[in-house]
Amino acid sequence: MENEEVQNVSDTGDFPAYDAEAIETKWQRVWEEQNLYKTEEDSSRPKKYVLEMFPYPSGDLHMGHARNYTIGDAMARQARMRGFDVLHPMGFDAFGLPAENAAIKHNTQPSVWTHKNIDQAVKTMFRMGFAYDKDRMFNTCDPEYYKWGQWIFLKMLEKGLVYRATSPVNWCPNDKTVLANEQVVNGKCWRCGAVPEKRELSQWYLRITDYAQELLDDLDQLEGWPERVRAMQANWIGRSEGAEIDFTLADTDGVTPTDTKMTVFTTRADTIYGCTFMLLPPESKLAAELVEDSEYKAAFDALHEEAVKVSSIDRQGTDREKHGVFTGRYAINPVTGQTVPIWVADYVLLDYGTGAVMGVPSGDKRDFDFAKKYDLPIVPIICEEGTDIYEELKGVSEYKVTSVDWDGPMDTVGILVQSGPFTGLRGGKHSEAEEAVVAYLTEHNVGRRTVQFRLRDWLISRQRYWGNPIPMIHCDCCGDVPVPYDQLPVTLPDNLDLAAGDTLAECKEFVETTCPKCGKPAKRITDTMDTFTCSSWYYLRYCDPHNTELPFSKESVDRWMPVDNYIGGIEHAILHLLYSRFFTKVLRDLGMIDIDEPFKNLMTQGMVKDEHGDTMSKSKGNVVPPSSVIEPYGADTMRLAILFVAPPEKDFDWDEKVVAGANRFIKRAWRVVWELSRTADASAVFDHTTLDAKSLELNRVLNAMGIRCTTEFDKGQFNTAISAVMELVNAASAYINEVPVESRDAALCYKVANDVVAMLAPIIPHWAEELSHEALGKNIPVYHQPWPEFDPEQAKSNTVEIAVQLKGKVRARIEVSADASEEELTAAATEAIADQLEGKEIRKVIVVKGRLVNIVA
């Protein structure tokens, strides 16, 4: 462990040995009895809301959790010492599929399984010494919490942000439920890794797309977020500026226009003369209608059956072989007037743009591969000046070349050729050619400038039991009817035998009800909500967790929000963080809060890996539980090791040597503080101007390292903050070894001991509490003690090291007084290299104060 060269302090002092288990057990009991970490609600202090992403209680906590929570705990403790009124809560994201599957496996109820795990996790949290306000702790599976999730759902319904639709959805064959687009990661289910299928289902959605532009624009406000996370969200929202173009479906004769429009979205309207075919996705209803009762239907059905088994990401891969089916029908290009064949292709997705695509094989790799495979025309329409094909087609406005043989699509930026009146214009995104084509489309009412987003509405329906019930009732007479507010919460039945295959839909006691509108028999909706709806507003409930009238009061949220420091893994960059931002904006528009964004500063901590660099996971059996460190070394050792081993945002490999090193430092610092306390006098007046040389140097290190520790703490760089304290402990140890007890400055000894304890208190609080009370005689909890202040002037060294050069080359380095005159510097430098100056005449001396003396001889 770095900086372990702490000099050994004599063990002959009359002070107790460090006993981690006894000390930690003692103070955890005291903190519990005093309810020390209850939020004070002191409006005279500035507020600081520190929050770690709450865990899913699938079992006991692991070292990844420990790192996350230790970072937040250190922030919260230091903020309290810096004079802030701190809100530092914790809870559990308790609904979800793993608990349901585990309950089935163990033949028990999800609620029983979940609460058992929560009880164990809470014990582990408090054994690690985390300063959570236990009075604000809740679980999202508690009816007192999820009632308000249902309440918010109904408010969104009233605002027009909730709707039900039948559409192709991602179906996980393993988990037997649907997945939102965001939950398909790299073509697989985010939770189990299975490849989703496409199914047509009636599902409930939230209109997150209504906030797409604001979600994108407000990323600029998030200066305290990592740029990587902001970029990931911007990419997922995926704003594209382009145009919609209305192609007309030709009748079965392939020529006569019909009233049916096929609208495409493109960012490259300037390439419309290169469109040689139209593409529809296999899921398209129009495609199914076009091939109905035709010779192409069997091939279409086969393509559809295979396409829905492949993930969207894989279907769009540029290197994947393309598959298509001709529909036998044609569309009319609104600019050229020519007809182009309509094909169905598996690389086209229903949820991109309008769902229809114009195929431009000379400008797109996938279109090019498709055209080559099915022998479709490839029309060069954009060329870079100076190329052979440009020289051949320069100024040609009508089609001259409709089939070329090259390795791939041509340039996407260049001069338009074979493009009618637009020939000769420079093409590209936002180019003069693109502007001219869009102007033509708009003028002739066959197209328009528009913006599309990759983001799709949030599908929240889940076909599983262990989730927040959607508070809707279906009546054959009235349709879908919301559950009245005074009937919330809709609670889950606890008598299902999940192991036997029971489902909510089969539970008569749950399903059968009466319509709130007409009073006739009706049925409850049996879908539950995506668990991310529970975690998208929990940070607001912490502000007012016992409110029985509302999810939270506006006054409480005005006091605490936004969260000042939010800590969690980067794997939540899109799902949780995007959804939370959406909920915040909706609740703002409902008049419940005034903020635009929920999290001011975001820290995405790195992962904890095993000694081989592999990610820890239960399935691999390489998880290190906190107890494996706490039992032999203590919680403080674990906390120190976690914070010291690497910057918070970096991954690190778990190493027992780091733990052992952390424990050695704790014991050495323990001895140093006790040894200083032998001379320390809290009542003595400290005056740095009266200190002798050794005391003055220790005081300088105290202030220099104190300033560094404070600065690094404020930046969240705990490893370098700890290094600064280690240097101070080194200096204090040297002072103890070199200065007899009777010669030590009593006020300085107290100040150093006190400040070492204070600076380490957020990191190793049990150790600090014991020393504060027993060694320093304080009766105030360290959590309530002030963070020490340091003086930059006293941090300055009285001496500086300067280089001595002879003819520009460094020959020596000397320690001199910081305010030495040029004459004194010259004399000291000359003496330092006297042997090298023998027989030489000094012709010139150049002095740069504080840096060097250059002698020319």
Regions flagged by a language model, labelled:
Residues 2-8, 12, 17, 25-26, ...:
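Residue patterns forming the tRNA-binding/recognition surfaces of aminoacyl-tRNA synthetases
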Residues 3-4, 8-51, 80-89, 112-120, ...:
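Conserved oxyanion/phosphate-binding beta-strand-loop segments in alpha/beta enzyme cores
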Residues 72, 85, 287-385, 390, ...:
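Catalytic alpha/beta core of large soluble enzyme barrels
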Residues 1-45, 281-284, 294-298, 377-388, ...:
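Basic, alpha-helical terminal appendages of large translation-related enzymes
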Residues 93, 158-171, 239, 449-478, ...:
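Helix-rich, typically C-terminal accessory recognition domains appended to large enzymatic cores
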Residues 329-352, 381, 512-650:
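Alpha-helical recognition segments enriched in aromatics with Gly/Pro capping
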Residues 209-239, 281, 285-325, 488-514, ...:
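Amphipathic alpha-helical
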Residues 40-108, 138-152, 266-267, 334-370, ...:
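N-terminal catalytic cores of NTP/NDP-binding nucleotidyl/phosphoryl-transfer enzymes
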